[in-house]
Amino acid sequence: MNEYNNDNMEQEKEKKKEEQKYKNIIKKEYFIFPRLYDKNKEIEYNKLRIHNIKEYICIHLTISLFIILIECFVFSFNLNIKDTTYVEICVVIFSILNCLMHIVVLIKMYFFTSESVYTKGVFIGYIVLNQVFQFLSLYFFTKRNEQSKNDIAHLKYYDNSFNLYVHFFVDSVFILCLPALSFFLSVLFMMMFLCLNILLINMIKFNKTNYGSDIYHICLLSVVLLMFLILRYMMEERNRLLFFFIKDMMFDNYKKWYSDYIGAHYDKDKDSTTINGDNNKYEKEKCEDYKFLFSNKCILFHDFTLNACYKDYYSMICFLNKLLKSCNIKEDMSSNTSVNINGDTYQNMNFHDNINSNIPKNYNSFYEELKKNLNESDILTIAYEVEVLKNIKKINCDEIGKNWDYSFIDSEYGKSTLVILEVGYHLISPYIENNENKKKKLQLFLLLINSMYFPNPYHNANHGATVCHLSKCLAHITDYDSYLNNTYMICYLIASIAHDVGHPGKTNSYLSETNHILSIRYNDMSILENYHCSITFSILQLIGFDFLINNEDTKLVEKNNYTNMRKFIIELIISTDMKLHFEYVDIFKKRKKSQNFDISDTDAINLGTINIKLADIGHTCLKWKDHAKWTMLVSEEFFSQKRVEELHKNKNIDPLNFSNFGKEDNIDEGMIFNYENIYINYINNINNINTYDYSYIKLNFIHHHDFVKSIPSTQVYFFEIIVMPLIKELQSMEKSKKEITQKVLHNLNINLQTWRLIEKNINLFYNTEKMTGTDYYKNLEKQKLLRGIRLLDIAEEDVISLTKNFKEEIKHGKL
C-alpha cells in the first residue's frame, strides 16, 4: 500500500513538473476571458492596444469637452448677478472644473508618451471625476430651474433629458471601447453609470410622475451598448478563443464537452491550462516530447504579434486535423502499413479499412491513436506522400538552369501551381547525395516554401522559380558552380528559390511608413528580406536541415556546418534588398580588384550575392516578350500599393493603427506565416488553382494613363542606374563563351532601346491584347494611331526600324 502511495506521489510530482514546464498561455481564472500568463507581456499588450486608439481617445475628449462648454454656456446664461445663489455658483464651478479636467487629460494624452499616460488609473480617474462633475452640475442646474420655475427659453433645443442622453451615449461608448479596462470592469462601470443616470432622472423629476418613458429609453440604450461591448470584446483577435469553445459546445455533445473540458480540466487547484494539439482538447500536456509547431513564434507572445497568442494554436490544430483527414481518406493509401506506437512497430494496420469504415467509433479511435504517435514532421510527410507525389511533374527540359533565354514565364512548368517544388527539385536534387530520406526532406521543404508564396501579380511562386533558374544559369556562366561544393550549391539555390517567400506584395518603404508589424519586428532594416529568411529557417528548423549537407563532398568539408550555411543563405537573401544595392556592388568591385580575391573561399559569398541580385531583376535581361510581361506584372503590383497608399491618405488612417491589418486593400493576414495559411495554399496547389498565370491576371493600372506614361521613363532609369553597372561587374567573370555579353547584356540593350522608343511614343505600349478594354486604346483605334505591330511581338529588327521611322516622322514634323 505504501509503495502504491509512493508511486502516486511520484506521479503527482512528475505531473506538477510537466505542468510547470508547459505552463504558458492562458490563466485558468481567465479561461473564458483570456489574459497572458506573464504580467509584463499583458502590460505590453495593453499598451499597444491603447496606443492604437490614441486618436479615438483624443476625439472623444474633444467631443465631450465641446458638449461641456455648451453646458457651461447654458449654465451661466441665466446667471443673475444681482441675486446669485450658491446653487448657481456651484453649477458654474462644477462645469468649469469639468472643462479644465478634460483639457488637462487631452493635453496629457496627446503630448505625452504611452508609458506615462496610458494607465488604467488615468482612465478610471477621468471616468469617475467626469461623472461626479456631470452629476452635480445637472442636479444643481435642474434644482435651480425647478425652484425658479424658469425653463430655458433662450435655448429651446437644450433640455435636461437631451443632455442626459447625449452624455450617457458619448461616455458609455468611451467606456465600452476602452481596452485599458477589462471586460468585467467595463460592464461594472456601465451598470454604475446606468444606475447613476436613473437616480439623476428620479431626482430631477421629483415632482413629476410620468418619467417612466425616460427610464425605459435609457435602459434600452444600455442594452444596445452592452451588446456593442460584447461584440467589441469578441472581435478582438486574442479573445477569439471563446468562439472555439462555443463552436465545440454547438457541434459536440454538450454533456461530453462539459465533463471532459470543465469537469476534468478546469480544476481550481490547477494554475494554468495549455492546449494539447494531439487530441484537439484544451488540457494538460501528457507527452514530454510533444512540441508545438513553432511554439516560440506562434504560441508565446513574441514581438508584439497580436494575432499569434490566442489564434494560431487553434489554426495549427485545424491544419493538422485537415491534413490527417485528407491523407487518410485517400484510396491509394497502402493497405499494409506499419505504425510505430510507443517504440513498438505494429504491422498490417489497414488505413483504408479504418478510415472508410461505416462505424465512426472505430475510425475515431484509430484516428486519435494515430495522432498521438505522430509529430508534426510525420503528419506533413504523410500529407506530402499521399497528395503531392501524384501531382509532381517531372521536368524533362535541359534548358531550365542552363539557357538564359529560355521563356520560363510561358512554359508549362512556369504555369504549374507546384512550380517551386518541381523546378526546385529539378535544379537542387543533383547536388543531394544518393539518399532517399534527404531527397524526401528536400521535396517537403520545397512544398512548404511553395505554399508560402502568395498569388501576387509579380512576387509569386513563378518569380521565385524564375530567379532560381536564372541563378543557376549565372552560376554556370560565371563558373561559380565549379568553385562551390555540393552543399553550398544547395544553399545557393535554396536562397534563390526562397528569396521572396511570404512576400505580401508591398515594398519595405510601405511597411515602414505604415508601421506594419513586420517593420516593428525587424526595426525597419531589410524588413521583407529578414522575413523571407525567418520563414526559410523556420521551415528548416521544423523538418531538419541535414538534407542540406552532402557527406560526399571532398572540399570545404570543414565549412559544411549549419552556422556557416545559415550565414551564407541569409547573406544571399538580404542582398536582394534594393536599398543595399550599391553597397553590395561596391563591395564586389573592391574585392575583385584585390590581389587575394578568391571565389573558392572568402569571396564565394560576394560573387553569390551579385549573381542572385542580377537573377532577382533578371527579367530586364530576357527577351523582350518575356521582359514586357514581367514589367506588366510588377507595374500592377506597384499600382496596387499606390492605391492603398492613396486610400490611407484620403481616409487619414493612422499609420500606427494596427487594427487595419488584415483588411481589404491592406496586407492580408493570410500572408503572415503560420500553418493555417500553409494549409490553404497547399490545398489550392493540390487542386491546381493557379492565380498567378500571366494570362489570368487582371491589370488595373492600364486604365490610368498617367501611371502608364510613367512606366517607360522609370524603366530607362532602372536600366541605366541599377542593372547596367551590375552586369558590367559580372562581365569580367564570364567564361570563354561570353554569354553575359552575347545574351544578358545584349538583351538589356535591346530592351533599353525599346523603352526609350516607347517613352517617346507611348501609343506603342497600348498596342497589346491586355490594353484593348481601356478608353485610351479605343481612342487610339478610333483615330487610327495604333502601330501595326503588337507590343509583345516587338523584335530586335522592329526596334531598329521603328526607331528609324520615328526619327524621320519627327524630322518631317508628323509627330
Curated annotation (Swiss-Prot):
Active-site residues per Swiss-Prot or TrEMBL entry: H459
Chain positions recorded as a divalent metal cation 2 binding sites: D500
GO biological process terms on file: cAMP-mediated signaling; cGMP catabolic process; cyclic nucleotide metabolic process; gamete generation
Keyword Oxidoreductase belongs to the record: no
Residue intervals on the Extracellular side: 78-86, 142-160, 205-210
Membrane topology qualifier: Multi-pass membrane protein
EC number(s) from the headed UniProt entry: 3.1.4.35
One Pfam family this sequence matches: PDEase_I
Keyword set includes Transmembrane helix: yes
Cofactor dependency: a divalent metal cation
Keywords from the named record: cGMP, Glycoprotein, Hydrolase, Membrane, Metal-binding, Transmembrane, Transmembrane helix
Glycosylation sites: N207
Sequence ranges on the Cytoplasmic membrane side: 1-56, 108-120, 182-183, 232-815
Sites where the protein binds a divalent metal cation 1: H463, H499, D500, D616
Catalytic activity as recorded in UniProt: 3',5'-cyclic GMP + H2O = GMP + H(+)
Disruption phenotype: Impaired gametogenesis. Gametocytes are morphologically normal up to and including stage V of development; however, gametocytes fail to round up upon stimulation of gametogenesis with xanthurenic acid and levels of exflagellation are severely reduced. Higher levels of intracellular cGMP in stages III to V gametocytes.
Protein purpose: Specifically hydrolyzes the second messenger cGMP, which is a key regulator of many important physiological processes. Probably by regulating cGMP levels, required for activation of gametogenesis.
Protein's UniProt name: cGMP-specific 3',5'-cyclic phosphodiesterase delta
Organism: Plasmodium falciparum (isolate 3D7)
